[in-house]
A protein has these predicted regions:
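A short, proline-enriched helix->beta-strand linker immediately N-terminal to the Walker B motif
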Residues: 62-66
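Short catalytic/signature loops enriched in Gly
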Residues: 128-157
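Conserved ABC ATPase "signature" region
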Residues: 20-38, 147-148
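Conserved ABC ATPase signature
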Residues: 43-47, 51
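A short, surface-exposed alpha-helical micro-motif characterized by mixed small hydrophobic
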Residues: 110-112
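Hydrophobic anchor residue at the start of the ABC signature
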Residues: 57, 85
Length: 157
């Protein structure tokens, strides 16, 4: 059940002193990610992809981290669900004071979500820059190449 999925890291790390406190934390997390307490009694297969991602986010937050690593957090989701998850992550970042590290090939998502970007080439960082500065005037050739390949809307009307 979803309750157990979210409660497991709390129990493992002993960040709550009682089962009652664990239940309250799980309830609060489910509310915070927009699922509600009733989700705790269901199984993952009963949820959509976006809802499962919300469950994963709740689990990741269950031990109150200061840093959240998001590795391709929206890659398997359709565009409208992607937007909802990204908005949720932005809200959680503001509400909880989280630092987030985004790992993604989706440059529009990176542009929307990140303050600073590190571009990697063959497993090594080739450029680190503030997001808008990087997208406007990247200095490394590989960064320029990636930005050039980004999908763009053309207005020929």
């Amino acid at each position: 059940r979803v309750f157990d999925i979210i409660a497991e890291p709390i129990r493992f790390h002993k960040t709550a002193s009682s089962e009652k406190e664990i239940a309250q934390i799980v309830h609060d997390l489910l509310e915070h990610v927009g699922l509600g307490e009733s989700a705790s009694q269901k199984y993952p297969h009963e949820f959509s992809g976006g809802q499962r991602q919300r469950i994963s986010i709740a689990r990741a937050l269950s031990c109150r981290p200061k840093i959240l690593i998001c590795d391709e957090p929206t890659s398997a989701l359709d565009v409208s669900v992607q937007a909802n998850i990204l908005n949720l992550l932005k809200d959680l970042q503001a509400d909880l004071g989280l630092t987030m590290i985004f790992i993604s090939h989706d440059l529009p998502v990176i542009r929307q979500m990140c303050d600073r970007v590190a571009v990697m080439l063959h497993g090594e960082i080739c450029e680190i820059e503030e997001t808008e500065k990087l997208f406007k005037s990247a200095s490394h050739e590989y960064s320029k190449h990636l930005i050039k390949l980004m999908p763009r809307l053309h207005s020929n009307i």
